[in-house]
Amino acid sequence: MSATYSIGRLEHANLTVSDPDRSAALFRELCGWHERWRGASQMGGWTIHVGSNDSYVALYTNEGRGGPYTKGQPLNHLGIEVDDLAAAEAVVATAGLQPFGHDDYVPGRRFYFFDWDGIEFEVVSYALPTT
């Protein structure tokens, strides 16, 4: 039996954060992304979309919910590819976040960090080191 598949791509991820403006500023600086949209969300609360022309991260908050938002707890981390790992790490540290788990492996290099809401990110570069 033969099946026909379309080629998929990740169009967006939706993250619940405590301060969408703060998170959007981090991603603009870290990834060179731009704000694509902001406004009230369908489920109440507020959302900012930040990303490239092809994909984005929706940064959602519902201030009236109270307490941590538990949907999606199985998420391990989101990976972000950058050209300059050292510059990316400087952005993360300047934001007051703690990079950890540095590793050089084939075919790249990486580090991790948790944002202000406990969401883990992996920052990876496949560019050849300049030193």
Predicted regions span which residues?
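Short amphipathic alpha-helices in soluble, non-transmembrane regions
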Residues: E29-L30, V91-A95
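Vicinal oxygen chelate
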Residues: M1-S6, R38, A93-T131
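Conserved beta-strand in the GNAT
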Residues: A58-Y60, E122
